[in-house]
Amino acid sequence: MLRRPAPALAPAVRLLLAGLLCGGGVWAARVNKHKPWLEPTYHGIVTENDNTVLLDPPLIALDKDSPLRFAESFEVTVTKEGEICGFKIHGQNVPFDAVVVDKSTGEGIIRSKEKLDCELQKDYTFTIQAYDCGKGPDGTGVKKSHKATVHIQVNDVNEYAPVFKEKSYKAAVVEGKQHSSILRVEAVDADCSPQFSQICSYEILTPDVPFTVDKDGYIKNTEKLNYGKEHQYKLTVTAYDCGKKRATEDVLVKISVKPTCSPGWQGWSSRIEYEPGTGALAVFPSIHLETCDEPVASVQATVELETSHIGKGCDRDTYSEKSLHRLCGAAAGTSELLPSPSSSFNWTVGLPTDNGHDSDQVFEFNGTQAVRIPDGVVTLDPKEPFTISVWMRHGPFGRKKETILCSSDKTDMNRHHYSLYVHGCRLVFLLRQDPSEEKKYRPAEFHWKLNQVCDEDWHHFVLNVEVPSVTLYVDGIPHEPFSVTEDYPLHPTKIETQLVVGACWQEYSGVESGNETEPATMASAGGDLHMTQFFRGNLAGLTVRSGKLADKKVIDCLYTCKEGLDLQVPEDANRGVQIQASSSQAVLTLEGDNVGELDKAMQHISYLNSRQFPTPGIRRLKITSTVKCFNEAACIEVPPVEGYVMVLQPEEPKISLSGVHHFARAASEFESAEGISLFPELRIISTITREVEPEADGSEDPTVQESLVSEEIVHDLDTCEVTVEGDELNAEQESLEVDVTRLQQKGIEASHSDLGVVFTGVETMASYEEVLHLLRYRNWHTRSLLDRKFKLICSELNGRYLSNEFKVEVNVIHTANPVEHANHMAAQPQFVHPEHRSFVDLSGHNLANPHPFAVVPSTATVVIVVCVSFLVFMIILGVFRIRAAHQRTMRDQDTGKENEMDWDDSALTITVNPMETYEDQHSSEEEEEEEEEEESEDGEEEEDITSAESESSEEEEGGPGDGQNATRQLEWDDSTLSY
């Protein structure tokens, strides 16, 4: 059955529903119930030099208060509830901001506020928060979302090109080998991303070269290289990053081809010149060990400096042995038995020496020579400790006894009191005890068996004797005797002893008594005396000191060389290198497993000579090396290296002595207790002459030459010798004296003899000046003394450098008694004439007298002084008149009157007597002699006045005699010529 359609809603019902709906919408708009919502994390990407950020997920804020999409046709869309009004970024210095694109959907974007640089910062992290528009027209009741984290990465742009780390590269390879890698070139890129910052490839741009480069920059050869074909290759290499961007600047690579490798030391010079006074000099500054790429486990290198031919094994100070002991701090009392020959020590004059002063003076004993030491030089008490020191060079000359030092009976008996001798390669010291009440065996002979006794090298031997023990030091190393023989003490006698060096003195009885050496007989009282047991070898520096033993420090000081090898390596440069040095600094041993570190240590080895004036000459150097390899079968051998250090000749100092050479003193001063000072104004200086190169280039100007410049230097002196010239000093009436206390304060010793006095000791020139100022000469019998002459010579380094001979003549002024002044005519001739001659000789010299009241001038002295004064006045007047006459002559020649000055000089006689004003005074024989000389000079003037007048300029430069002649020639009136 058909149903009836439902009736439509009534209009009233429709109105009711609309009102309900409208009422509900108004309520919803009035309430902001929900907060906006964001994703917890966002990831973004932005390209540098751009500002748009691509986010994942997109930036959208949701709000449940938002109207549904199907309700968009209703009035609720005009309200603010549910809309997103903005985003807020939290963080410091964040170069981004967030912008709302659509408020209703909550969509937004993030963008950069400035251009970003990936090289400065690759990524950024910050938080963001969304907020809605609130409720009502005024936007109150705003709600914010939670904070979401945003990570943004800055994408790189390939804006930088690769750049090589080095401007150029160098390498060297050995010919004939295929190398897996010769060297590596490396470039870097400043871009920040791995894609653009990494170098993906290298390329050799130079065509047709036997080399290739891989992606890591390693260059290798593609074929074996030939040194004869090419010595060096030059390659141009470029680089590309992974973005295919090429380096803006290519790099130059130089590969040198070396000939076939030979292991050994390279980069050294066979000759090294050493300038004295320059300190340490590196001898191998560029040396390195070539191992030819062989694997090396360790290397040992030994550097030796050969100095055995210099002095006594090396360069040492060449002062006397006594001075050296004092410099090393030894106590006083050392007696030198082999001194350099001098006036005071003359017993070594006949011995052959090395004939040179550059090094130590050594004495040669050939088996037939010996020297007897004068009595009093050595005072030795065997009961007290004493020391014997000697330098010796001895070879293997068989098994005969050879005596170095021997003290034996002078006459009657052959007893040896003490002696030091060589027997084969043994050194024996004999010491017989003095007579005593106890007659029992005591140690008498001490034996040492040493190679140093007969190896023909210089060695230093020191015997410290303190009965009953004897200690021997050889080159500073102590040695105990291997055998000691005992014997009875000597029988008491009154026989004097004789000390001999180089042999032994004993009475010849016709039988050799076991002495193998042929005797050299000498006639003497008490029987035939002779020398026996002669020494064959060289000796130097033989000294004996009684009363005290030598200290070990003194022994080491005496032996220490002044030259040697030195190695000063920085702490960070000797890692893994072991260094050993000999006590003499002549041998250095280096060992290490790192060849590079060993090379650095070898480059720091230096030669040093601390002497101010070293001995010039060659010092040979030798390097011997031992290499240990991991594979012993294929280990390389390093040949030895030989060179030399040439020590150049030092600038020789010129020692100059200056002062007053000639002076006179009153006889009373000679006879006084103080005497007179011989060198009151002595000055000692030393200079050297150097060549100074000109500033201009000599090749440009051949006239420019090197100039010599003299420079004053300071050094020590070791000897000053004052000797008397003429007769020897007579100890009964004259002497040379000096204050001993002042000498000791200066460290200088004085030894007196009939020939003078010798000052010894290593001291400064100023100290010697002061000491010589103190030297005084006394003579308490001056009645017959007119003058005395002395000579002074100073030296350095035991006579190596000598000063000039400084001579002093001192005259005695004899004063007349008052009676003699009143009656001078009665003066004895033996007083007048000698004194008169002495004062004539003193003209032009210093006649200063520090005590004027102690001398009363004689009549002759007054007359001479007046004559000399008048003579000087005449010279001055003559020079003036000569110049005036010369000017008038020139004027006459200008007017044409050249003949007006001609005259007849045959009868012209001019006589000037400078003594005529003193005719009434008492005259001496000396005045008459002077007048005769003046008259003879006048006669010569009469012969040629015109010639003298034309040579007036020469007369002005002449001596007093010439000036006097000129004065007399002009004592006339040139208008009338009448007298």
Swiss-Prot record:
Gene3D superfamilies: 2.60.120.200, Cadherins. The record marks H824, M825, F853, A854 as: Cleavage. Residues 1-28 form the signal peptide. GO terms for cellular component: cell surface; endoplasmic reticulum membrane; extracellular region; glutamatergic synapse; Golgi membrane; membrane; neuron projection; nucleus. Residues 915-979 are annotated as: Disordered. Residues 925-959 have a biased composition (Acidic residues). Residues 881-979 are cytoplasmic. GO terms for biological process: chemical synaptic transmission; homophilic cell adhesion via plasma membrane adhesion molecules; intracellular calcium ion homeostasis; neurotransmitter receptor transport to postsynaptic membrane; positive regulation of synapse assembly; positive regulation of synaptic transmission; regulation of cell growth; regulation of synapse maturation. It comes from the Eukaryota. Changing M901A: Almost completely abolishes KLC1-binding. Keywords: Calcium, Cell adhesion, Cell membrane, Cell projection, Endoplasmic reticulum, Glycoprotein, Golgi apparatus, Membrane, Nucleus, Postsynaptic cell membrane, Repeat, Signal, Synapse, Transmembrane, Transmembrane helix. InterPro entries: Cadherin-like_dom, Cadherin-like_sf, CLSTN_C, ConA-like_dom_sf. Highly expressed in the brain (at protein level), with over 90% of the neurons expressing detectable amounts. In the brain, relatively high levels in the cerebral cortex, striatum, hippocampus and thalamus. Moderate levels in the cerebellum. Low levels in the olfactory bulb, midbrain and pons (at protein level). Not detected in Purkinje cells. Expressed at low levels in the lung (at protein level). At the mRNA level, weakly detected in the kidney, lung, skeletal muscle, heart and testis. Not expressed in the sciatic nerve fiber. The chain crosses the membrane at residues 860-880. Changing D904A: Almost completely abolishes KLC1-binding. Changing W972A: Marked reduction in KLC1-binding. Marked alteration in anterograde axonal transport. Disruption phenotype: Mice lacking Clstn1, Clstn2 and Clstn3 display behavior disorders, characterized by hyperactivity in normal environment, hypersensitivity to stress, and show tendency to freeze in novel environments. PROSITE patterns: CADHERIN_2. Residues 38-164, 165-265 form the Cadherin domain. Changing W903A: Marked reduction in KLC1-binding. Marked alteration in anterograde axonal transport. Belongs to the calsyntenin family. Postsynaptic adhesion molecule that binds to presynaptic neurexins to mediate both excitatory and inhibitory synapse formation. Promotes synapse development by acting as a cell adhesion molecule at the postsynaptic membrane, which associates with neurexin-alpha at the presynaptic membrane. Also functions as a cargo in axonal anterograde transport by acting as a molecular adapter that promotes KLC1 association with vesicles. The cytoplasmic domain binds synaptic Ca(2+). This is Calsyntenin-1. The lineage of its organism: Eukaryota, Metazoa, Chordata, Craniata, Vertebrata. The gene is Clstn1.
